[in-house]
């Protein structure tokens, strides 16, 4: 074989011309120590706070401590393979999670990776988990209701779209049950739901998912699970990841509801991370910025006006407001709402639903304490008919609590006091509601109407629950059109009052309970 020198020189010339000698500047560092989900890195001079870091074998971390000669980072996911001396690279990005309609109906981890075995999720894009909350000018007032389907809440502590309403109580008082019922009631309302489970047992989360599937609510719900077996860093970022997924819907002129179950465990996870990073501890060993941890999260729940939606969608959506409603859950110890984290979150939110152990154990479920529960902005969002009828119920319960305490000491009570006590007892019974049994506005209105107008005064106390069930069965069979009309319009006037009275009189005449 003959080699032609001119061909070789031509080939070398072509190679030299095509050679790209551009230098690439990269910010790299070296692992100094690793353990307990925390990594200390030497180098990374230009790293930013909260920046995503790339470790070997597709492992990521987040820079949280920027010190003079090292960087403290939390590791997200498995870190057993990371050794001292390993190379760490800056990414120039902050942590992002996938968002979009494709996420609905799926169970994902804190980084948006599917964990339900249903294959990969094809989303339109991703959003950073940390965002600045909407400003005052871009917000709209809270004047549309979020119906939970629970009489005790919708009548006494109403929730509006864009509100933050805290659910607070000891362990085993039905906090998650209230939140799950609220999600189930949204299946036909068009409100998208996000359930963020922080530090829960995987079996508990699986049970919630199964219940949502059984009641047809999983199709418009995203479940973000950072279980008890996950690292503290994953539990810390999970609520922010869920919030970013909810903001996607809000910014497109839709309504979303997000449940954080629960923020106590997120605060514990953040405390653990902070102590491992050797940050100075404060009250109850929490770091100094634990208030900011929750305030920057909950301030992102809001209702934004139509101009802001139009700006965020580049003119695609016009004339529609968007909202993200938050129901954070806080677990108290022995009913102590004056502890550090509970007081922080109470001061951030627009009201709280206080669930009491004594009420729960005595069979009042949902165990809402009407005296300590309050909704600071929900009143203007409440449905007209429920607002009108619910006021009497709240008053009856308040008087009952006062008189019940007084009647323990007084032996002879006058007739008016006795009547108030009896009506209060029956109203308490009417406020009871089974789990996974949300009621429509029409059904709720009739139950409140029965309590207000004295239709249950002559019903035995132990028959009240049966009376309510029989009443609702009768109304669904005989007055379905009226129920539908009340649910759709929410109006309350003399005509509707007369129709409701007529239906109640006919039911009472039959005595079918």
Swiss-Prot record:
Protein name: ATP synthase subunit alpha
Entry EC no(s): 7.1.2.2
Pfam families in UniProt: ATP-synt_ab, ATP-synt_ab_C, ATP-synt_ab_N
One cellular component (GO) term of this entry: plasma membrane
Gene: atpA
HAMAP family on file: ATP_synth_alpha_bact (MF_01346)
Annotated transmembrane regions: none
Family the UniProt entry places it in: Belongs to the ATPase alpha/beta chains family.
């Amino acid at each position: 074989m003959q080699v032609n020198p001119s061909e070789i020189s031509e080939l070398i010339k072509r190679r030299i011309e095509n050679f790209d000698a551009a230098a690439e500047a990269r910010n790299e560092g070296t692992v100094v120590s690793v353990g307990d989900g925390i990594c200390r890195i030497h180098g990374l001079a230009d790293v930013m706070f909260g920046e995503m870091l790339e470790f070997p074998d597709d492992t990521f971390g987040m820079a949280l401590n920027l010190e003079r000669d090292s960087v403290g980072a939390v590791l997200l996911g498995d870190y057993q393979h990371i050794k001292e001396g390993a190379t760490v690279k800056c990414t120039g990005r902050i942590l992002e999670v996938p968002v979009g309609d494709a996420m609905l109906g799926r169970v994902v981890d804190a980084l948006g990776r599917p964990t339900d075995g249903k294959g990969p999720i094809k989303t339109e894009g991703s959003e950073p988990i940390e965002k600045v909350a909407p400003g005052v000018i871009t917000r709209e007032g809270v004047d549309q209701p979020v119906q939970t389907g629970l009489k005790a809440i919708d009548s006494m502590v109403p929730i509006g779209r864009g509100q933050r309403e805290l659910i607070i109580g000891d362990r085993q008082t039905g906090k998650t049950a209230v939140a799950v019922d609220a999600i189930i009631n949204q299946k036909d309302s068009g409100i998208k739901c996000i359930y963020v489970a922080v530090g829960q047992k995987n079996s508990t989360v699986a049970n919630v998912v199964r219940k949502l599937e059984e009641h047809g609510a999983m199709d418009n719900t995203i479940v973000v699970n950072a279980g008890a077996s996950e690292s503290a860093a994953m539990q810390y970022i999970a609520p922010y990841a869920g919030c970013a997924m909810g903001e996607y819907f809000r910014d497109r002129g839709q309504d979303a509801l997000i449940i954080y179950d629960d923020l106590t465990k997120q605060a514990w996870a953040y405390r653990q991370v902070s102590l491992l990073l050797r940050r100075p501890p404060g009250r109850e060993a929490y770091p100094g910025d634990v208030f900011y941890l929750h305030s920057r999260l909950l301030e992102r729940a809001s209702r934004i006006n139509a101009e802001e939606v139009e700006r965020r969608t580049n003119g695609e959506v016009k004339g529609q407001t968007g909202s993200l409603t938050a129901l954070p859950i806080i677990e108290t110890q022995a009913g102590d709402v004056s502890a550090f984290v509970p007081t922080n979150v109470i001061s951030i939110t627009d009201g709280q639903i206080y669930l009491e152990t004594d009420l729960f154990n005595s069979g009042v479920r949902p165990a809402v304490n009407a005296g300590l529960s309050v909704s600071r902005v929900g009143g203007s969002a409440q449905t007209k008919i429920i607002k009108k009828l619910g006021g009497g119920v709240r008053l009856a319960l308040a008087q009952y609590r006062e008189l019940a305490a007084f009647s323990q000491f007084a032996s002879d009570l006058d007739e008016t006091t006795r009547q108030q006590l009896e009506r209060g007892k029956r109203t308490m019974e009417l406020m009871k509601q089974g789990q996974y049994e949300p009621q429509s506005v029409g059904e709720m209105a009739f139950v409140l109407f029965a309590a207000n107008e004295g239709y249950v005064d002559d019903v035995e106390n132990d028959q009240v629950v049966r009376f309510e069930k029989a009443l609702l069965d009768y109304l669904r069979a005989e007055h379905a059109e009226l129920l539908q009309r009340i649910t759709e319009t929410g109006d309350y006037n003399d005509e509707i009052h007369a129709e409701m009275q007529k239906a109640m009189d006919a039911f009472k005449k039959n005595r079918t309970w």
